[in-house]
Amino acid sequence: MSKASARHILVKTEEECNALKQQIEEGADFADVAKEHSTCPSGRKGGELGTFGPGQMVKEFDEVVFNGEINTVLGPVKTQFGYHLLEVTSRED
């Protein structure tokens, strides 16, 4: 069974999500940005979500996490919770 590890940042607006993505692409540390801006409790841990399999997260997450590039900031991804930046840190098929 496939497994992946990822971290994310959750914010309310697409605009904020894009602004944070730009900061990270310009050299800001993903974990620091998550701690400062993410509205998800995982933000306190730098956005770390741990390891999970398909179907354990919302559909929009699964599509990105199990198909997107590893170690690249992906998003904005819109879910019922808001807008996410995702970084897949590892994946096993």
Q: Where on the chain are the PLM-derived regions?
A:
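FKBP-type peptidyl-prolyl cis-trans isomerase
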Residues: R7-T13, F30-S38, F61, G75-E92
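Short, conserved secondary-structure segments in the cores of folded domains
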Residues: L20, V73-G75
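Well-structured core secondary-structure elements of compact alpha/beta domains
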Residues: M1-E26, P41-Q56, L86-D93
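Short clusters of hydrophobic/aromatic residues that line enzyme substrate/ligand-binding pockets
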Residues: L49-F52, V65, V73
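Glycine-centered tight-turn and secondary-structure capping sites
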Residues: E26-A31, N71
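Cell-wall glycan
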Residues: K59-E69
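Short beta-strand-initiation
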Residues: A4, N71-T72
